[in-house]
């Protein structure tokens, strides 16, 4: 029925006189003798294709996550720019996207906002920010359950990174004080 994997009984009997219907026949392939250079070239092509597939996967995974907050570890610092290991990818936290007077060491945990993901020749480039106004908004969404549930909405964010920030909030439930819910008991939510 399927000519690529099945043959008729007569052909099978010419190859193996003991063949029975429903049985598997093994057709040995002639040995292929690749030279050292050909084997090395094949290996390089395979490794290159795997790298390309990995880059495509990284780009596909992170392009949909623009605007999210990610956690990572500081891998190294190059010319003031911080290279952050996100687990399955590396991201760049440029010096101008860091909070002033903020200092990182190798191995430090970093929480940052995915600002941009670009497809470039040397692979996808993920750019992070700790000064973006939406970074503060996303942190509040994580920290304040009322914002996460949609009872309180963030209307606007203005900040001077490293010193102060102002967030305009509105409550759609008259019984909930939006500022009090965001500040928390003795400022516990703001301090977090």
Regions found by a protein language model. Name each.
Residues 1-192:
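RNA-contacting regions in translation and RNA-metabolism proteins
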């Amino acid at each position: 029925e399927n000519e690529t994997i099945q043959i008729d009984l007569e052909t099978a009997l010419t190859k193996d006189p003991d063949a029975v219907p429903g049985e598997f026949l093994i057709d040995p392939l002639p040995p292929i003798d690749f030279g050292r250079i050909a084997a090395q070239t094949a290996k390089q092509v395979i490794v290159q294709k795997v790298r390309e597939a990995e880059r495509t996967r990284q780009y596909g995974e992170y392009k949909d996550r623009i605007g999210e907050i990610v956690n990572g570890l500081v891998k190294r610092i190059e010319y003031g720019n911080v290279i952050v290991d996100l687990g399955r990818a590396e991201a760049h936290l440029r010096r101008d996207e860091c909070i002033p007077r903020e200092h990182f060491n190798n191995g430090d945990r970093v929480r940052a906002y995915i600002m941009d993901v670009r497809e470039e020749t040397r692979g996808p480039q993920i750019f992070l920010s700790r000064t973006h106004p939406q970074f503060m908004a996303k942190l509040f969404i994580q920290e304040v359950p009322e914002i996460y549930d949609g009872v309180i909405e963030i209307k606007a964010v203005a900040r001077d990174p490293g010193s102060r920030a102002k967030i305009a909030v509105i409550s759609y439930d008259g019984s909930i004080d939006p500022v009090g819910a965001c500040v928390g008991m003795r400022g516990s939510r703001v301090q977090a």
